[in-house]
Design a protein with these regions (language model features):
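Short amphipathic alpha-helical segments with heptad-repeat character
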Residues: 20, 24, 28, 72, ...
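Charged, amphipathic alpha-helical coiled-coil/dimerization segments
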Residues: 2-8, 83-143
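A structural signal for well-ordered alpha-helices, especially hydrophobic packing surfaces
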Residues: 27, 59, 115, 149-152
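Exposed, interaction-prone assembly regions rather than primary DNA-binding/catalytic cores
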Residues: 139-155
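N-terminal helix-turn-helix DNA-binding core of bacterial DNA-binding proteins
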Residues: 28, 32-74
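N-terminal leader segment of winged-helix/HTH proteins
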Residues: 1-42
Length: 155
């Protein structure tokens, strides 16, 4: 049974405010649990997973600046994570063809194999954490959040 808003006669702005707070709380709880599981089960971090995920989608690599833009973090954060991935043999950096000043980061075959293990665990954890949503609920929430994102992007 889905709980209803506390007061259905209140202004929609109040309901939207509570919705925003609920989204933040749920997102924070999920993120904290993912961080904990990555640390405990793989001795790694969520930001490291995020960098590996971005690099896994670009087999030819990504410029460091594009990687930081994609992940919406500073160049310094990305550089530190890529440095550690490189030290561990999971990534490498090469000069960008045509611009030796720019570097492209990409996963090594070992890094790709590690990422696939992390990604499988990540998907399983999220499936477990969101098991309270049936298929229809998950699709509806996904579509509504997509609609909201599109409306914000259009502003």
């Amino acid at each position: 049974m889905i709980p209803q808003p506390k007061n259905t006669s209140e202004p929609i702005s109040k309901t939207r405010l509570r919705l925003w707070l609920k989204l933040l709380k749920a997102s924070s709880k999920i993120e904290m649990e993912l961080r904990r599981r990555f640390r405990v089960e793989f001795a790694t971090t969520l930001p490291r997973f995020d960098v590996m995920a971005a690099l896994s989608r670009k087999p030819n690599g990504l410029k460091m600046s594009n990687l930081s833009d994609l992940l919406r973090v500073s160049n310094g954060n990305v550089t530190g994570i890529v440095d550690r991935l490189t030290e561990d043999g999971h990534a490498l950096r090469v000069a960008m063809p045509g611009d030796r000043r720019a570097q492209v980061a990409r996963l090594t075959p070992e890094g790709q194999a590690v990422f696939l293990k992390l990604a499988a665990a990540h998907e399983g954890w999220l499936d477990e954490l969101l098991q309270g949503l049936n298929s229809g609920d998950a699709a509806t929430l996904y579509n509504l959040l997509g609609k909201t994102e599109g409306e914000i992007d259009a502003q």
